[in-house]
């Protein structure tokens, strides 16, 4: 019985059980033999479900009340068995197609006086449950459950744990369940009370799965007020070409409108005018502070371990906070609770292995996933001792387990550990990495109230080592969080669903510690540690006002408290320190309190067209400080101080959505303002000049643009075209005469074309082409000499442009011979297929033949790069 426990007791039950199945549906034609002693009604029903094609639908409280049942029948019609089973019990049964509906007889109610019948509140019941994969037992996130009765249609989507709840009037309903990568399923029910209906969906694909962008094309997505959201999950559309055969989720989302790549060799990205640090990246609710490997060439996310990714560009739900621009919410696989299995891949620079299986079938499961590069193994082949003793690799390990504690409780434990190591023997080295751990407890109070409680740990640190003679030192930096979260989802009635919750985070930031060797010409220094509490409470309601109008509104209230121990400063606009105040351990330095209201609106013009609008305010209390134009593992996170204030953004978005089956068209426009934006003084050195506030300047920003997406989801040819037209500016006191200037991430045009074609059952071809306007950069305006040394001087911040960027990637996947429990494939790809020499950086020097002239030197990272990888699953 799909809404109850699977019968573990059947393994030891002292009963005999036999049946003769029939394809015919009438209960008279299905005959069973059944012998049970002192069993509960739930156990009897589950035994009948095991040996017949029928499923029972009933209120949980009705079933659990019936116990101590004994029954002994041999080769009797099911209809006769049902009559015998329920004779003398206060339960009625009704056959509805392949379902047997159980209910208590209706109680006689006294006549209603006072209000006429037309004004009385109609009786409502709740249909609730979970949606899971039939093959693995994992929850299905974002599945759509549509209940239809005559001309009335009501829908809902499962939450991030696969739970759903629908409030409906009594009656007969057709329930249609759909999800990406799953077969559509229909159930027929007769609703006469609160009913639990757990659903198992069959996967559409049995071979290897890839990541691709997918969105629902049904009416549910049109009716939802949520804007600027994209969901990625395992699906039937095959792979996008990748660099060196390594699948990269963060690179994939950068092919969507409004999400801009930070460039080659950089896993950072910009969303609607925000900086790379303004994106909240979560792995099972834990923040990942540096989502990159190998200096940004690859992301920290091993696709074998990832189940679902949701990206919010605007109108972020109130449970998310702490960043201005976007949320990337990554959920790990839960592990197969039915069978053991493994998958993995072997590429040119890395290999992966993923193992999963049940700890106790149907109740608990585990997942272990690992990945490592082996570029350092090739370095050992060199005859140069400096090279063959060098190290260059990264590794990561994902682990997860979940336990079903009961009908209403489930516990999840998950963790991630990743590390990068780059070193040149006897010269220098750097290593960095993330560690996260999450413990989550799901509890179902009742059919309408769902709870998730989480305890989360996150740590990021780096260490730089220099072994140069006379200048030996180590630099260590760290940011560490402990976070407690609680979220309640209350499905109040057919028109309202409410989310309320809180989170409390303790931040510890160790900006840097420099330790010298015995003979080094450098003093040991420890920058002051910073401590803070970041708390928030929130409440939102999604209201289905009419069949055409939906509204989500709410507020998040954030409080950021700066704690001692440490010194805090008064600083003049010139950067000079005017005074110093010392605070003891735990002493409150300052508290920033910020309300963050939000509202989103959807109006469905017809069955295929909708208009949406949203407004959201976000606050950011942690800031990334960097001296380089590209992301670096040595970039430093700093928290608010008495000088560094919370960044605040206000964003308004308007969108048009059209289902042009088999195409989908989305057009969104936005305008965003940002306060307390950070830039740097000319000649700033963020590593040695302390306090850091003396190196910073503050101001405001604005961004606006138009995003266009046309996507085809079905057929042999699938893909999308995205285009973004945008402008991003900053106005910082002390820069460019206090006038508006281009932010580094300002790009006028950004285009991506993605296509996948299933040539045959075995071959799949794919390609993507990207183009974007070059970044705004600062180039020298002149030069001068001092004692024979050449120095460049700069007059206008971000007054020039890098060359325009464009690139074509192509790929092909060959599905190899499949066996019953084993599948494999070969993936071939070419990155930058026509060898475009895109600029990574441009430096300047005197021309060798004419010192009066200055020449620009362009550095290119990638030209044409072919790759091959082998992937398997069993």
Enumerate the predicted regions with their spans.
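Gram-negative outer-membrane beta-barrel transporters
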Residues: 671-673, 692-781
